[in-house]
Structures are given as C-alpha cells and as structure tokens.
Amino acid sequence: MTERVVLAYSGGLDTSVAIGWIAEETGAEVIAVAIDCGQGGEDMEVIRQRALACGAVEAVIADAKEEFANDYCVPAIQANALYMDRYPLVSALSRPLIVKHLAEAARYHGATMVAHGCTGKGNDQVRFEAGLAALFPELKVLAPVRDSGMTRDKAIAFAEEKGLPIDVTKKSPYSIDQNLFGRAVETGFLEDIWNGPIEDIYDYTQNPAEPREPDEVVITFTAGVPTALDGKELSPLEIIQELNRRAGAQGVGRIDMVEDRLVGIKSREVYEAPGAITLITAHQELENVTVERELARFKRWVDQRWGELVYDGLWFSPLKNALDKFILEANKHVTGDIRMVLHGGRAVVTGRRSEASLYDYHLATYDSGDTYDQSLARGFIDIWSMPAKIANMRDRRLS
C-alpha cells in the first residue's frame, strides 16, 4: 500500500511545490490540509483546487474560525496573554489548532507522515513538531524547506519545470502570517532594527493619526469570556471580528518589537492585533475590579508562564493544561462591562461595572459616607512592619 503524507497547506509557493517534491522524493501520496483560522485573502476553495492541480491526491479545507476563537483566542484573553508583555501570540495560538487538524487528518487517511513548510530559523517548526509529538508520536515529520535546502529560487525553478499553477512573479519583501487574532510581518527592510515601519506594511490597522472622531465601545464579559458589544450578544468570533474592524480603524494594536525567539535568536517583528489588544486590555481591567489582591498577584505570574508555554510550542503540555484550570477558576467572577474609547492608536478604559465587583465605594471614598475605620490602621502597620523592624534592630546590634 502506498504511504500517505498529510501536508499543512497554505496555498503559497513553498507548500505547493512541496506536494510534488514529497511525491518525487518519497513516492508517497500527498493529502493537502488547509485550515481557515480567519486569515482572509484567497478563497479557500481556490486554495483547495490549487493543491489538487499541484498533485495532491486529496485536498481538505477545515473552517476552524469558530474553533479558533472559542478554544484558542478566548483562553488567551482570559490569560491576558502577552509574550514579553507585548505580543498577543497571534501566530503561536493558531499552530496547535493546525496541529490538531493535521493529526486528525493523518488518522482518518491512514497517513504515516506529516509535512510542513517551516524554515529552520523560526519558532513554528518547534510548535508543529512538538505538538505532533504529543498528539501522534508515531508520525514521521517531513520539513522540505528546512531539511532539504528548498530555497525560494529552487522552489520557483521546480514550479516552472512542472508547470504548477502558481504565480511566482510577485514577491513581497516581507514574510506575513495572519489570522483572526492578528497579523505578523517580518524580514525585508525590517531586519535592520533602526528602520522604522512604513504605512505600506499595515493591513489590519489604519494610521492612528487619521481618524478625527473617537469610537466608544462597551465590552461585556461573562466569566472572562467576551459575550457582547454595546449590549448586543455576539459570539467570541463575531466580537473579535468587529473589534478588529472598529479598533483597527482607530489604529489600535500596532506593535513593533524585538522578540526573543525560542530557537535562540532575537527577531524584529511588527504585529497588528486590534481586536486582541482591545479585549486583553478590557479583560485586565475587569480583573482589577473583580479579582482579590493575592489571587490577582499570583495570576499575573501564571499568565506570563502560560504565554511562554504557548509561545514555546507547549500547548499540549501537562503544565499548560494545569494552568488552564487555574485560569478558568480565577475568571469565574470576571463578569461585567468595560467601557473603552478607541482613538489615536489606543484603547483607553473609561468605565467599569460588575455585580461581582470588589470595589466598595463606601470604603474607598474620602467624602461623607466613608465607612472605613481608620483607627485600625495603626495596629495593622505595627504588625505589618514588625519583621523588618526586628531584623533591622538585629543588624544594628551586630554591626
């Protein structure tokens, strides 16, 4: 029986050429699997037909937008996931979803191999292969670009030789990855970290200086899950899409950073994530209102570690799964509304309300109606400062 390979297919040059290359090198049949994570661009049916025209024996399209929003983006919002305090894990979140579908397709079609088009310098090779090792360790992984020296020039020559239906005349100077949660741009002139980004590289966001009028929005959360905009109930997918539009129109969510890659190098990345940044900012503020101080302090550490695990390709690890449960528990009272003004590239919180609020006006006010017993402060301070007081008295005695 002929072996089968499941290929993570994007419709681009490298993975289109990989179909024929894998067939020639291994003699295996190639099944192309393309996952719709809300990246937009070409129609998915056009991509499917291209895979077949390039030699795939079967081409599968999975509409995973709802799944991506519910099972990957929402947990990231609940975890306030910002790698290095800035990057909302745009690409990193989609990789375990793609891995899950690749593993399912491999089982369904009886494949013995899985292939991807990642290079040997990026994080994605690790995310794909670590995920596959966790879900389907029996599979052999092929990486033509990394392991077989498939350069762009070689890929173009192969496509022309075989008459593959791929437009190879247009080449963006950038490497771009995008999905529902945002857009990542790298390489080209951005590799000189002194060069400022130009407006041409942006697609999800307008120039922050252009909109004259601000946009006010009220975001509703239920147990940390976004459930409504301006009082209208919507799915997480619809909310992210709408905030991509509205926050993007105000230039919100532009990020230009030098990032510590998993593979040991620093890389300059430009991101656009208008919906993600708006939702994470709103969620953080609602946590400030509804989560007790010690839990909030510890959750900040958990959130950071959760983001690092996802960035590092360990979505399916025991630690990440355990942290998921903690984050869900910590979000059980994160229910309420956050009002924000979107303008000038910023999403600014201007109001908060929650039935689960820990903010007590009568305890916080300095006006009449204050119920805080200030006479308790002196005793509290004496006890709170006692360990440091005793230690310093000892140090003076011994010096």
UniProtKB/Swiss-Prot annotation:
Q: What does the UniProt entry say about where the protein is found?
A: Cytoplasm
Cite the binding residues for L-citrulline.
Y87, N123, R127, S175, E259, Y271
- Give the Gene Ontology MF terms in alphabetical order: argininosuccinate synthase activity; ATP binding
**Cytoplasm as UniProt keyword:** yes
Q: What pathway does the UniProt record associate with this protein?
A: Amino-acid biosynthesis; L-arginine biosynthesis; L-arginine from L-ornithine and carbamoyl phosphate: step 2/3
Q: Name one Pfam family in it.
A: Arginosuc_syn_C
Protein's GO biological process: argininosuccinate metabolic process; L-arginine biosynthetic process; urea cycle
Detail which positions bind L-aspartate: T119, N123, D124
Identify the InterPro entries for this entry: Arginosuc_syn_C (IPR048268), Arginosuc_syn_N (IPR048267), Arginosuc_synth (IPR001518), Arginosuc_synth_CS (IPR018223), Arginosuc_synth_type_1_subfam (IPR023434), AS_cat/multimer_dom_body (IPR024074), Rossmann-like_a/b/a_fold (IPR014729)
What GO CC annotations are associated with the protein?
Answer: cytoplasm
Reactions that this protein is recorded to catalyse: L-citrulline + L-aspartate + ATP = 2-(N(omega)-L-arginino)succinate + AMP + diphosphate + H(+)
**What UniProt keywords apply to this chain's record, in alphabetical order?**
Amino-acid biosynthesis, Arginine biosynthesis, ATP-binding, Cytoplasm, Ligase, Nucleotide-binding
EC number(s) given by UniProt: 6.3.4.5
What is annotated about its quaternary structure and interactions? Homotetramer.
Q: Which family does it belong to?
A: Belongs to the argininosuccinate synthase family. Type 1 subfamily.
Q: What is this protein called?
A: Argininosuccinate synthase
* Source organism: Thermobifida fusca (strain YX)
Organism lineage: Bacteria, Bacillati, Actinomycetota, Actinomycetes, Streptosporangiales
